[in-house]
């Protein structure tokens, strides 16, 4: 295989928000891939891609390009978009997505799997960093330390969903919400003390909020702090700031977190062990997009071998993520 020019994997991107833009840039770093087109629900003429020469199409015209795209990256939201788009696109393409509503993954998997099996395509779902990379590390932790406890901490980072929830409060102009892990809780876990931690003991939510002139700040703060599913179960800090300060100091989309497994071995369980995987990301969408691209390579290869149906990170051999041959991997990384 050495010296032979391989055909490039032809990638399509559905959705051109932060994740779609991250995928477009990520393709530049993967020499075995090329971007065929971006698909949007907006007016295609209103979008100016970062890459010269890349065409933008209406999402409705995707079905006409089934023979021109090897893998479609679905860079849409998990709440309302992916539950519809996942099955729809799996009926036509190999797909990859970062579906991240944890408690609905099995239901989503089943709906995508049915369509991918009908079309004989591969659909890799939920393969960002959590679910995704963290999921793999939780699995490794459980099988290596069967008697133990798994902990996941997120942050410090911007939560897009929580920021959106604040923006929906009457009188709010704009907002950013940071999820912050509680350091003392992480230290207890790292010591192998296996603490039972409540939601409130693991994370703090810090909000930077811009409000309309004359808005009732007390009411807004109360509405944020008591919002079910988002803030009611957490210690929440609310800061009211100007729009200028929000743009100047809070325009990035950083994130990160820790996946930790603690356990014991030995005749009397006297030996403590800790497995820790952590991420510190300047750009959550850029990093997530790069994980989707690695799994796009795997989806393409598996489908070439005659595999089809929905898959998760648990089902994909790690070697399929890499552009290197099996021999190169053994020589360079094993």
Curated annotation (Swiss-Prot):
EC number: 1.4.1.16
Notes on temperature effects: Optimum temperature is 65 degrees Celsius.
Catalyzed reaction equations: meso-2,6-diaminopimelate + NADP(+) + H2O = (S)-2-amino-6-oxoheptanedioate + NH4(+) + NADPH + H(+)
Pfam families in the record: DAPDH_C, F420_oxidored
Alphabetized InterPro entries for the sequence: Diaminopimelate_DH_Ddh, Meso-DAP_DH_C, NAD(P)-bd_dom_sf, P5C_Rdtase_cat_N
Keywords carried by this UniProt record: Amino-acid biosynthesis, Diaminopimelate biosynthesis, Lysine biosynthesis, NADP, Oxidoreductase
Keyword NADP: yes
Family, per entry: Belongs to the diaminopimelate dehydrogenase family.
Quaternary assembly: Homodimer.
Protein name according to UniProt: Meso-diaminopimelate D-dehydrogenase
Organism of provenance: Acetivibrio thermocellus (strain ATCC 27405 / DSM 1237 / JCM 9322 / NBRC 103400 / NCIMB 10682 / NRRL B-4536 / VPI 7372) (Clostridium thermocellum)
Gene: ddh
């Amino acid at each position: 295989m050495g010296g032979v020019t391989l055909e490039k994997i032809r990638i399509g991107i559905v959705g051109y928000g932060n994740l779609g833009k991250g995928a477009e840039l990520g393709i530049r770093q993967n020499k075995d891939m090329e971007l065929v087109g971006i698909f949007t629900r907006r007016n295609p003429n209103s979008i100016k891609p970062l890459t010269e020469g890349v065409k933008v199409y209406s999402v409705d015209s995707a079905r006409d390009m089934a023979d021109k795209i090897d893998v479609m990256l679905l860079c849409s939201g998990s709440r309302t978009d992916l539950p519809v788009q996942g099955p729809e696109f799996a009926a036509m393409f190999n797909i990859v997505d970062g579906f991240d509503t944890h408690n609905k993954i099995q239901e989503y998997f089943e709906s995508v799997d049915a369509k991918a099996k009908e079309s004989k395509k591969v659909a890799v779902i939920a393969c960002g960093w959590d679910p995704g990379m963290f999921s793999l590390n939780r699995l490794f932790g459980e099988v290596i330390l069967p008697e133990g406890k798994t902990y996941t901490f997120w942050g410090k980072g911007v939560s897009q969903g929580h920021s959106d929830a604040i923006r929906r409060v009457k009188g709010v102009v704009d907002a950013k919400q940071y999820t912050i892990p509680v350091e003392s809780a992480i230290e207890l876990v790292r010591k192998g003390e296996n603490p039972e931690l409540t939601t409130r003991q693991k994370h703090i939510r810090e909000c930077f909020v811009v409000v309309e002139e004359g808005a009732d700040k007390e009411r807004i703060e109360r509405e944020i702090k008591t919002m079910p599913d988002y803030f009611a179960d957490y210690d929440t800090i609310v800061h009211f700031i100007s729009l200028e300060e929000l743009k100047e100091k809070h325009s990035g989309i950083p994130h990160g977190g820790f996946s930790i497994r603690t356990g014991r071995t030995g005749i009397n369980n006297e030996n403590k062990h800790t497995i820790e995987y952590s991420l510190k990301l300047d750009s959550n969408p850029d990093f997530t997009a790069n994980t989707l691209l690695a799994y796009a390579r795997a989806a393409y290869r598996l489908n070439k071998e005659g595999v089809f149906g929905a898959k998760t990170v648990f089902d994909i051999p790690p070697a399929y993520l890499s552009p290197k041959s099996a021999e190169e991997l053994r020589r360079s990384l094993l």
